[in-house]
Each structure stands twice: as C-alpha cells, then as structure tokens.
Amino acid sequence: MDTLVPINVYVKAGIHIGTRHLTKDMKPYVSKIREDGLAIFDIRKIDERLRLASKMLSYYEPNEILVVGRRETAITPIKKFSEITKVKAFPGRYPPGTLTNPQLKYYMEPEVILITDPIMDKNALHDAYESGITILALCDTNHTKNYIDFCIPANNRGSKSLALIYWILAREYLRNRGVIGKDEQLKVPVEEFETKITVEE
C-alpha cells in the first residue's frame, strides 16, 4: 500500500525524529537509536497510525471532535485543521474544566479528542479521561500511553512535523467523509499549516 505522502516528505518534515528518552510503550514504533542517542520512529508505522486515526475521526461529525495543543508549534496547525474541517479546537491553553464542568460557558461534550502532547496537554487528557471521551494523541518517544485510547507515534514538537501531521489528518478526514474526492488534494498547502517562529527551541 502506498504511504499517505511520499516517504521523503515525511523525512524532510522530521516526523520520525524522536527524543533521547524511549519509554516501553513507544518502543514498538521505533526502528533504531541513532549514535547521538535520538530514538527514530519507523515511518511506515507512523503512516499506518495516521491512516487509522483519520479513519477513526471520520466516523464523527466535526462538532463531535475537539483538538487541543498548547505547544507553540502546534497553534497554527490546529487553527488551520479546525478552519478546514470545521472541527472544534483549543489552539494554545486549554481551559481546565471545559469537558467536566457544565457550569462553564465554554463547556463542551465532544465524543472524541485529539491531543497534541499528552504531557503539555495533561489537563485536557485528564478531563477527557474523566468524561469518558475517546482519546487520540500524538505520542513522542518519551511518552506513555496512559489514558490514551489510540496513539499516533510522531515527532510532536517540530513545526514542520506538526504541520504535516495536521495537513494529512485534515485531507484524510475530508476524503473519508466524501467532502473532497479520494485523490483530491487540499487547496491549502502544507506550508500554511506551519507555525513560523523565529527561534526554534
């Protein structure tokens, strides 16, 4: 089966570059440890999980999905993803209680949540778990799968990696729901999903 984008596109975005810490949960998705200690994801496994995640999300209406991501490099990708798919999103800080406190004016009851970083977005992760919401998450090599129903292994830090991930998810969501043709591309290029920051962390 062909990959969702050519392998070299994944490589160029650095989607496979993990961290120097590798948990037992993420070991099955890693192909090697580089000489500098960085764990490297198996790109075909990333592709397979992105394909499955897109399929899962496509079973839900846009208003039944919430996407969160506090990391600076996630803000533009999430905004673009939300704009194109009409999915609800919290780019930036997630207000605690959004999923658990009906008294809040921004309270919502999504069926599924997509979390960009289970560590940085831990408030959203815990709220979703308490509410019984299906949890999908982008997991780097240093994460565990605690509370997570479906893990997408990937570099969830880099601006290019996150741009490509959310671009693919947007395209596949729209394709699977019949909004665009099976071979149709998004009218918005992947570059527009990228957060432009002057100094990389």
From Swiss-Prot:
Pfam families documented for this protein: Ribosomal_S2 (PF00318)
Keywords: Ribonucleoprotein, Ribosomal protein
Gene3D superfamilies: Glucose-6-phosphate isomerase like protein, domain 1
A GO molecular-function annotation: structural constituent of ribosome
GO cellular component: small ribosomal subunit
SUPFAM superfamilies documented for this protein: Ribosomal protein S2 (SSF52313)
CDD domains, alphabetized: RPS2
UniProt-listed GO biological process terms: translation
HAMAP family: Ribosomal_uS2_A (MF_00291_A)
Family membership noted in the UniProt record: Belongs to the universal ribosomal protein uS2 family.
Protein name (record): Small ribosomal subunit protein uS2
Gene designation per UniProt: rps2
